[in-house]
Amino acid sequence: MFSVIKNDKHFNARVGFLNLPHGRVDIPCFMPVGTLGAMKGLKHAVLEKLECNLMLANTYHLYLRLGIKTVEKYVGLHNFTTWNKNFLTDSGGFRVFSFSDLRKIDLKGVHFKFHIDGSYHYFTSEGIFAMQEIFGSDIIMPLDICSSYGIDYNEANLYTNITTNWASSTFKSSKNRKEGYNGLLFLITQGNFFKDLRKRSINDILELDSPGIAIGGISVGEPREKYLEILEYSFLLIPKEKPRYVMGIGTPHYILNAIYYGIDIFDCFNPARITRHGSLLTDNGIMCIGRKEYKDDTSKVEKNCICTLCKRYSRGYLRHLIKSKELFGIVLASEHNIHYMFRLISKIRAAILNDDFLNFRTSYLKKYEEENFDE
């Protein structure tokens, strides 16, 4: 299921692959977010051309906006969306818990009010697994509580215990799965920013021996130093035989630091989100295309990029589209940013294989931090 091809000589970075039901996924892996089964503004063909073999979809949104019965009629999410590569589906717990005034937690699950239409629902750990089984998800993520930065120890302890209980019940559900379904369950560790809670959570999750481990509840508004501290601490407790997934990170510097600590998989909607403000990822920093200096700029956004934008259109034209709020501008910018992320990951893999990750990381982060990145 999981194999490591090369470990970096100096750090914990590594290159390898996961064998999943819908094909091989090379690691390190950046996973684009396709909340409803598609990335905003992009055809599946764009991702397929980039050899994207793993996309994240959101159980919360699919359940509430589409309905489980519809997916069941199509015999799974792959048939419904015609995406023939792998899906990782998360529980949507982060979304539920972001509306603290609209939900109530108990030992079995969470009662919540849908913020769009006011309807009431109840998610349980077993129910969330059953939904994702119907989806035919290649990687299933259980229901968990992603707690906020700054809460007190007692609250963090309670949420950590509940998350562990939910993980245990989800694991039991995975042992009674439908015949023929062979998706993998990755369990999530929590603990907020308290090291003893992190350690206990990881040890409890490891006892269940799921195929993969996710580190949840970081990159939630904490200072970067605290993020790195907990990331390193958590990594050291997870066996190297397990694929490691950090949830919700996707900016270049966060990815490079995660790979440095031995993280294999990450996801983030940031590359698509920042295009709404005309922000483009480049090797020279984030380009804010809305600036006046680009109004009459006839050059391409980036010379070495082969996305539709960089092959055909000028900076000035893209600025015009973004300023005019033309959807086509967002589509072009989104495709460019996804191209950039996959190109970056490809360079990182090559650097690890060539024993050059130290130089690559140092030079990239130096340039990154010198530039004016408006995230």
Curated annotation (Swiss-Prot):
Region (RNA binding): 248-254, 272-276
Active-site residue numbers: D90, D267
Enzyme superclass (EC): transferase
Record keyword Acetylation present: no
InterPro entries tied to this protein: ArchSynthase1/Queuine_TRR, TGT, TGT-like_sf, tRNA_ribo_trans-like
UniProt GO MF annotations: metal ion binding; tRNA-guanosine(34) queuine transglycosylase activity
One GO cellular component, as annotated: cytosol
Pathway(s) per entry: tRNA modification; tRNA-queuosine biosynthesis
Cofactor note: Binds 1 zinc ion per subunit.
A biological process from GO: tRNA wobble guanine modification
Coiled coil: none
Superkingdom of origin: Bacteria
Positions contributing to Zn(2+) binding: C305, C307, C310, H336
Cofactor(s) named in the record: Zn(2+)
Keyword annotations of the record: Glycosyltransferase, Metal-binding, Queuosine biosynthesis, Transferase, tRNA processing, Zinc
Binding site for substrate: D90, S91, G92, G93, F94, D144, Q190, G217
One of the Pfam families matching this protein, by short name: TGT
The EC number(s) this enzyme carries: 2.4.2.29
Catalysed transformations (reactions): 7-aminomethyl-7-carbaguanine + guanosine(34) in tRNA = 7-aminomethyl-7-carbaguanosine(34) in tRNA + guanine
Its job: Catalyzes the base-exchange of a guanine (G) residue with the queuine precursor 7-aminomethyl-7-deazaguanine (PreQ1) at position 34 (anticodon wobble position) in tRNAs with GU(N) anticodons (tRNA-Asp, -Asn, -His and -Tyr). Catalysis occurs through a double-displacement mechanism. The nucleophile active site attacks the C1' of nucleotide 34 to detach the guanine base from the RNA, forming a covalent enzyme-RNA intermediate. The proton acceptor active site deprotonates the incoming PreQ1, allowing a nucleophilic attack on the C1' of the ribose to form the product.
Subunit structure, interactors included: Homodimer. Within each dimer, one monomer is responsible for RNA recognition and catalysis, while the other monomer binds to the replacement base PreQ1.
PANTHER family attached to this UniProt entry: QUEUINE TRNA-RIBOSYLTRANSFERASE
Family the entry assigns: Belongs to the queuine tRNA-ribosyltransferase family.
Protein name from the UniProt record: Queuine tRNA-ribosyltransferase
Organism: Borreliella burgdorferi (strain ZS7)
